[in-house]
UniProtKB/Swiss-Prot annotation:
Top-level lineage group: Bacteria
Pfam families for the chain: APH (PF01636)
Annotated InterPro entries: Aminoglycoside_PTrfase, Homoserine_kinase_II, Kinase-like_dom_sf, Pseudomonas-type_ThrB
Stated family: Belongs to the pseudomonas-type ThrB family.
Catalytic activity entry: L-homoserine + ATP = O-phospho-L-homoserine + ADP + H(+)
CDD domains linked to this entry: HomoserineK_II
Alphabetic keyword roster: Amino-acid biosynthesis, ATP-binding, Kinase, Nucleotide-binding, Threonine biosynthesis, Transferase
Stated name of the protein: Homoserine kinase
Amino acid sequence: MAVYTDVAADDLADFLKSYEIGDLLSYKGIAEGVENTNFLLHTTRGSFILTLYEKRVASEDLPYFLALMAHLAARGVSCPQPEKTRDGEICGALSGRPAVIINFLEGVWPRRPNAVHCAGVGEALAKMHLAGLDFPQHRANPLSVSGWRPLFDLAAARADEIQPGLRDFIAAELDHLEGRWPRHLPTGVIHADLFPDNVFFIGDTLSGLIDFPFSCNDILAYDVAICLNAWCFEPDHAFNVTKARALLNAYQRGRALSEAEQTALPLLARGAAMRFLLTRLVDVLDVPEGALVKPKDPLEYFRKLRFQQNVASIRDYGVEAAGAVA
């Protein structure tokens, strides 16, 4: 979450007249995250989240995200639900941006995830993947392997400003990934952005998944790989096998990875690291002036990619390569 677009109090009050969520008491921007503009609203009827969708979210994709959240919630996945206007609409416009209000989900995201948190997210991810199997809508992933080189083209000329040699490193890795990316693994609905700040806990109990604007249809194990990178590294950049084992074991108790998925997981993790390296690289080189946003460090994912390049098999993540896991 972040704030790119400012919203005047009078404009917001007028916008809220279309909803039955009470009168506005206060609102504040949420600076965490990098993609959309978010505000925490306090009204006479409770707390809500207002999201203004920015550059990477097309307005025509919003029905997919919003319908998906309703679909998942109906199947027991805890996630926020959009508030409808008095006319039954779930998407409006504010400050020139598509805007949605969702209910406030209780809990906090873990600043220092532990193995219990990792097990919780593994279990929830498997549940989400299974719940999404009968979701009727389809959205291709614009940030999968076919979208990485266009992203690189946006940043290539200045990549070495971030780190000398980064341009050649990325170019070589893209060649490797594009030539080996798996085409026949199980697919379905994925979250595609399940970082710690998109998962809420109350104590050690997972209370909900949030922030679905990157959800799409893609390789299910790719979603697992994104989580390995997002949850299982320490602040000193060391990979924590205990966390990885907890995440993978919990996921496989809900949905076992096939032999082909297990074999492909290290490559998928390289691709997942590349995706976030590239989007962060583009973002850090193009922060709008005056934006209340904290760009994420692209070199964090450069280091994770370097680690994943040396992973030989799923055993390096702390689990056995075949059969049931403990």
